[in-house]
Each structure stands twice: as structure tokens, then as C-alpha cells.
């Protein structure tokens, strides 16, 4: 049966909130962080084409993730969500994609081994092509142009042609997301994540890392455990040769998201089939805004970034709108306070949600609240602040009687120097050597692995 032939189904959102919802009802709200396309005809043509293209994910994958996130809310799983600040179309090549997957697999191996529980692996890629900006325009040497808003909207080069929003880029974003998803699925189905051979996940350039010995000891321990289990069973354990892997991105460019919001056979309501796990950021989380209106109607698990300016009342009202039936696995709050503010700002939010008996998954984004600029103009993050915010999150949740259920990190499997500190003690002078991000700084492989190890050590302390 074609998607267009699916019969209308009851709208569970309207029943819950008393307000009618459709994939385009967001258009009646204030939509922030949206580009202005100069050619409405070209925009309509691109969206028409996008609507007829196949979805990027499936309904059963989305619902499986929601069930796993519900288990994370109960403390039975831990969420690892990571990837680029903003993907570039040029990064859609095998080496970059496999390295992204490798670093997440290695981090998850550390967490599974140390936390003794399953890890939900979610990539912040295969669709993370839009980026909110603090200003609509950028000025250089007296020339003012539209800000770069991610490859799905415009190009980073500082020219008038590059910065002009181009709706055809949405079609390119769909194609690059599909190629990325296809390659990730092929790697996983082909045994790339096989626990019988975790040594295959190694990144060659880190063979001399200060963390290498500790990690290789862990790999050997897991290999011994697998061998022992198979010896007892008298046969090879085949379900160790693949994993579940999901994607996420910021649902920022609503025309794109709407075009990939579909109904499917034997499922009520609407699903965003561009990603498994959409989120919205602080700049677009207004209760009466277009982005909240859009997210309230899709059946995907969703997440909201929560910053230091959010009040307990705002948080509870967001829950009322986005998860009125307290559905397990539906709603995550990703707090991003910054190491300097988390001790003051997070506890009142935890207390309010707990006191009201609301069901959410708490996730720590230790990146966005710790961004700073160096004297020579680089945006960076200090590793000690990133690690410190993660560790304080565990302490604050333990004190509040709540549970930190995951982390959300901007990272890469490449040998970049964008965040200072870490095992190699990178300094501001090192930033010039391999700073490749077009937007925000990312943890490199070693720093990412070190965060995973810090999570394990901290969890052992607060148990």
C-alpha cells in the first residue's frame, strides 16, 4: 500500500490537548530561526519533490527506540547520543562515517562494561544539517550577508551566492542522509559492531594514546567474557554480531520536517520519518512557538534542550503540551547549564518534575554551556568543564533522588584539536593545528573516550 493511500486515522494529539494538529499546523505559530527563501515557486517545487521521496527511517525502528528510552527512564539502560555539531555534505564519505560510528561504538563498549547495563546508541548525524544562529546576518569588512545556517539551507563560503538560502539543498540533505544511513546500516549488518571482534573498531591514529592501554585491557576483558559465555553454551552466540543504532537531529527547518512527516499502515497518528529522535533547542522551545507545535503532534520520542534560563513552571507546561498522557519513552530533557551554573540552576528543575510525578528522561549536554572564545578567535571548550558538568550532573541527580539517564555530546572520530585539555593536555596553541568544525568545537576521539571512562568512574561513586 502506498503511503498516500493510507486511510485517515484519529488524531490522538487533538484528543489529548483539545487542539487540532496537522503536520502543517505549526505554520499558524511564530517560527524562529527560519530562513527566508527568495523564490516561493522553487521552494514549493522542492517540498513537493521531498514529499514523494522515500522515508529515511521506519516506524518500527522509531517505536523500538521509544521502548528503549522508556527502559532508560527506569534506570535499565543508558543513552549515548553523539556526533557532529553540524554535518557538512562533504563529510558524506566512508572514512568519516565509519570513524563516527567507531568512536560511538567504543564509547558504548566502555559504558556497557562499566555500567553493567545496555546502552542506547544514537548518532547525532544522518540529518544534522541545520544549525540555529544567534544573528540573522554576519558582517565582515563592511559586507553583511545572511548567516550560515547549515548545509541544508546555505553554504559556509562568505559570498552572496553561497549564503542565499536554496530550497534544493533540502533535496541534497535527504540524499546525503539516505547515503549515510545506508552505509551505517550496511556496516552494522555486515558485522562492523561484532563483539567477537571489538579490536576492529580501533582508530589507527590513536595507537599511542595515553588511554590506549586502559581501553585495550577492557577489550581483552570483554573478549574473555564472550569466550567464557560461548564455552558454557557450547556454541557461538550470534546475537553479539550486530547492534541497534538510531539517528537524531535538531528539528529546526520545519518545512523539511513536515515534508517527511507521514502516516503509515496500521499505526495511528503521524511519524517524523526523517529521523528516529528529533529534538529542539533552547532558541525554539517557546510554548507558543512553531517548533513546539510541530513536535507535539509526532509520535516519535522527542527531546527538548533545557538551559539556565528555563523555569520550573515553563518545564512543567512543556510536559503538559508535549506529553499530556505521561507516555513512557516519549519525552527527554537535555539539560545544558554549563559547569559554572549547573549546581544552582538544575536542582529546582529536578525537584519540580519529581514533585509533579512527571515521567521524563534526563540527559546531560555538557558541551553547549561551556563554549568560550580564545584571544585568537577560536571557539573552544575546556575538557575539564565538559567532564566537570557530567560529573556534577550525576551528583545533583543523586541528591535530588532522580536519575541521569544519558549524555548528549558533540564529538568526532577524527584527529581534531578543537577542545582544549584532555589526555594529551591540548592548549590554545594546538587549536590552529587541526580545527575543522564550521560551527562549534567537538571532542576528538581521545577526549570522547575519556568522557566515557569518567562516566563509569562517577557512576561507581554514586551507586
Task: Name what the model sees in each region.
Residues 2-154:
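Long, contiguous, compositionally biased segments that the model treats as domain-scale units
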Residues 64-66, 288-291, 318, 346-349:
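Glycine-rich, charged/polar anion/phosphate-binding loops
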Residues 86-87, 92-338, 381, 406-408, ...:
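Active-site-facing alpha/beta catalytic cores
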Residues 315, 324, 330-362, 368-417:
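Non-transmembrane, aqueous-exposed alpha-helical and coiled segments at domain scale
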Residues 413-431:
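Short glycine/proline-rich, acidic loop/turn segments that cap or connect secondary-structure elements
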